[in-house]
Amino acid sequence: MDKNNLVNGFTNYETFTFVLWLDNDKKMHDLALDAVKTAYNKNLRLSNAIYEIQSFLETYLHQNIHDNFTDFYRDMIVNSINKINTYEVAKHLFHNYVENYQIEQKTA
């Protein structure tokens, strides 16, 4: 991937926007953090932990598409959601959690 085409370090605008919302919306942040903690506490291989978080994110995204969006708007919303690189987001969340957890352990 050409690093010049990244949006603030992420694959695309949709992925970057999703990460912003995860970081700034308490409910979304807490749900994602719970998924990350669960994967981390299972002592899974890194790839399996990231896959588990990615699965959670994909389910979350698609479960929250409201049925009142129909036709054109639903198609546009689903298309944008499908552009989100959930693997990249899961990896980002996991690495941030591990980094913060290690910092907490050092200061405790």
Locate predicted features:
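Acidic interaction surfaces
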Residues: 1-108
